[in-house]
Design a protein with these regions (language model features):
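N-terminal membrane-anchoring/stem segments of glycan-assembly enzymes
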Residues: 1-17, 153-154, 162-166
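Short, well-formed alpha-helical segments that are part of the catalytic scaffolds
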Residues: 4-10, 30-43
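Cell-envelope/extracellular polymer assembly enzymes that use nucleotide-activated donors
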Residues: 19-22, 50
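Donor nucleotide-sugar binding loop of glycosyltransferases
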Residues: 30-33, 58, 117
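Acidic donor-binding segment of Leloir-type glycosyltransferases
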Residues: 38-85
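Long helical/loop segments within the catalytic core of UDP-sugar-dependent glycosyltransferases
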Residues: 77-100, 123-198, 203
Length: 206
């Protein structure tokens, strides 16, 4: 696993890989942010792309917004999920459903409240290939839209970085590792080998 604070832009220097990447986006009542997320994913500088949105028990306009993208771009798939087993955490269950419908050799799990740079996927895949790693996770830039977020996000980030220093989480002699659930890029075979999201099905932090 690689979780790094180092920029993955050097992945852009790697040869382009002609590989299908499936992006899975879990969405529970995300009408405020899902359009921005999807539009940024569809603008990726990557030829072979599948975007799967799992609308998880939504009661707002999330499904309608995704449907608009489905109708104009055949790379987008909408999956409607109406229930969640008691033994599963909601997000993990939605991600498992998305993975079951994925066709790619690489799986990218991306949160609905994110906005991707056009080079994100190419840089991340290039860096994963360069390092020969089965899981690549990134630290993202955070946007604070509310005073409460502006107060709490820096404190939470500092706490995480003290527990999981980016320059140490990849060392083989450390039992403690860390990956950011906002973006996790898996090799499909390895993801299935370790049990996928079923292995952490009742964990709030997957």
């Amino acid at each position: 696993m690689l979780s790094t604070g180092i920029s993955v832009r050097r992945g852009l220097q790697e040869p382009a890989v002609d590989e299908l990447v499936s992006i899975i986006v879990p969405a529970h009542n995300e009408e405020r942010v899902i359009a921005t997320c999807l539009d940024s994913l569809l603008a990726q500088k990557w030829d072979r792309l599948q975007v799967i949105v799992v609308a998880d028990r939504c009661s707002d306009a999330t499904e309608a917004i995704v449907t608009e993208r489905v109708e104009r771009d055949d790379r987008v798939t909408l999956i409607r999920n109406t229930d969640c087993p008691e033994s599963w955490a909601g997000k993990c269950h939605a991600l498992r459903i998305g993975a079951e419908h994925a066709e790619g050799d690489m799986l990218a799990f991306i949160d609905a409240d994110t906005e991707a740079h056009p080079d994100l996927l190419r840089a991340a895949v290039g860096e994963a290939k360069r390092r020969d790693t089965a899981l690549l996770s990134l630290l993202t830039d955070l946007k604070s839209c509310h005073w409460f977020e502006r107060c709490t996000q820096p404190v939470a980030t500092m706490a995480l970085m003290s527990l999981f220093p980016p320059d140490r989480v990849n060392r083989d002699d450390r039992a403690r590792t860390f990956a950011n659930g906002q973006f996790m890029l898996f090799d499909r075979d390895w993801y299935e080998e370790v049990g996928g999201h079923a292995a952490v099905k009742n964990d709030l932090l997957e």
